[in-house]
Amino acid sequence: MATTEKTKALVLFSGGQDSTVCLASVLARYDEVETVGFDYGQAHAVELGCRAKLRDALTRFPGWGAKLGPDHMIALPELGRISETALTRDVEIEMGENGLPTTFVPGRNLLFFTYAAALGYRRGASVIVGGMCETDYSGYPDCRADTIAALERAICLGMDRAFTLETPLMRIDKAATWALAHELGGDALVDLIIEETHSCYRGDRSKRHDWGYGCGTCPACELRARGYTAYLAGKA
């Protein structure tokens, strides 16, 4: 992770575990880094409130402070209005009739990358980074590697500019994501992720677990908890 690439990167940064590990990974590898968040009326919007504190904390890690540039926030209220999902409505978190969980927001990652590329076009950022993962994911079709590859080609063609859509976590599971955090920033980064990132779909930060805050029963909490347990077992 010591190699630094002289390219500006723009990170999709939600304030969650995965996007925070991605941001740390990018800060370790690129000279200039900016972040972008999206407010689409998500039920777990509490994660957006974590972003500023996380960004500030990451600047204190050796060599990262000078690299982290401006943060951007894009409002996408219409996405929330047209989406009948557990993240945008009072809908039970369960498996839907279409074989996808009700937490799937159709088009979300497609829009995120497209808006980020449009911003990157103006900001001179040719690398757009997201925390999508198809190893531990919930079956979301917009988290698959082939989806991201197709979208990258479409964005490059549609904007007539070379962009790279980078997904550092695509092939690793949640335990390996915790391990990557430790590799990048040691116990300090792992502790930061536990205390300040948010994953819970219900937006619950009233309960503190070994792995962080959350309801403990939604799919996001269960995945994070299992990954943390496996990570600790791997260290033993």
UniProtKB/Swiss-Prot annotation:
The keyword Cytoplasm does not apply. ATP binds at residues 13-23. Disulfide bonds: none annotated. It is an enzyme of class 6 (ligase). Keywords: ATP-binding, Ligase, Metal-binding, Nucleotide-binding, Queuosine biosynthesis, Zinc. GO terms for biological process: queuosine biosynthetic process. Its EC number is 6.3.4.20. Belongs to the QueC family. This is 7-cyano-7-deazaguanine synthase. It comes from Parvibaculum lavamentivorans (strain DS-1 / DSM 13023 / NCIMB 13966). The gene is queC.
